[in-house]
Design a protein with these regions (language model features):
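Conserved catalytic core of nucleotide polymerization and phosphodiester-bond processing enzymes
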Residues: 1-210
Length: 210
């Protein structure tokens, strides 16, 4: 019966492998099945720790609330309660907006919510449920240095992070009498950038793994 659900599964191959492993385990056979482990909103967890944000920490399991929290569902439900069922947003879409916005993205939230009332409800909700973590987003934008070729920092284990600032140069070239635009990435200062938040968070993630 379970195998009949494979076409409906979000990840059909993983679902199929899991069912096979389940059947073999029930027969007492060694399965050697590699399980998948994932953190609970690891980006939000790290931001909560960096900022000492108790509200955000309770949202994603950093502070034990007595049961397993699902930050994405909590934020989604907060939005639905605020704007009503007419919002026509899904948890999965909301999750995409939350994940990317915590790394500085504004494009994905706009794709999900548009640029009107729904987007503002999203911003207000994030500010309410994870105030310090959300504010750190703006800090990462504000500390962008428009004069440097790289951003550098040192982690507690003396790992030196060096991230080049990359921009693009567009040039027109002729090839067989046809004009083409060639885009080249170069190491050059940029007036604005959104990568600091993601890079700092990921560097701390790597530090914890080491």
């Amino acid at each position: 019966k379970l195998l009949s659900l494979v076409p409906q599964a979000k990840e059909p191959a993983l679902f199929y492998a899991g069912v096979q492993a389940w059947n073999q385990a029930n027969q007492g056979l060694p399965i050697g099945y590699p399980i998948s482990l994932d953190a609970c909103s690891s980006g939000l967890q790290l931001l909560a720790c960096l900022t000492g944000d108790d509200k955000a920490a309770k949202l994603c399991g950093v502070i034990d609330t007595g049961h397993r929290e699902d930050a994405y569902s909590v934020i989604y439900n907060e939005m639905v309660n605020s704007i009503g069922e007419s919002a026509k947003i899904s948890r999965d879409d909301c999750k995409d907006a939350i994940m990317t916005s915590l790394y500085g993205s504004t494009a994905v939230p706009k794709q999900v919510f548009g640029e009107g009332k729904l987007l503002q409800v999203f911003v207000d909700t994030m500010s309410n449920v994870a105030p310090a973590a959300w504010a750190l987003n703006q800090v990462f934008l504000d500390i962008w240095d428009s004069t440097v070729l790289s951003h550098d920092w040192i982690l507690p284990d003396n790992f030196h992070v060096h991230v080049n600032v990359m921009g693009t140069i567009k040039e027109k070239v002729q090839f067989f009498n046809k004009p083409y635009e060639v885009i080249t990435k170069v190491n050059t200062p940029k007036e604005k950038g959104r990568s600091l938040g993601a890079n700092v968070t990921h560097s701390i993630d790597g530090f914890l793994v080491r």
